[in-house]
């Protein structure tokens, strides 16, 4: 499968989620990735942490790490979904070298 790239994504969410809501949120986004032909999807909750500075009036946030493989052309749609989600404070997507 040529053109497949491995990605590692870290997402910072508002602290408003309890554990079950956080799992549901992560599951929904993993399903979106799957619908965009992503594979090897793994979701890891990194817990709630204090932030070094305020972001959108938030001093704490929940961190989620998502690893997946996908073709780069599908990434733009996923990024736009994240940008419009009011619960997402920040996110970073990195190419993961094999």
Model-derived segments and their meaning:
Residues 1-61, 69-98:
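Long, contiguous binding/interaction regions
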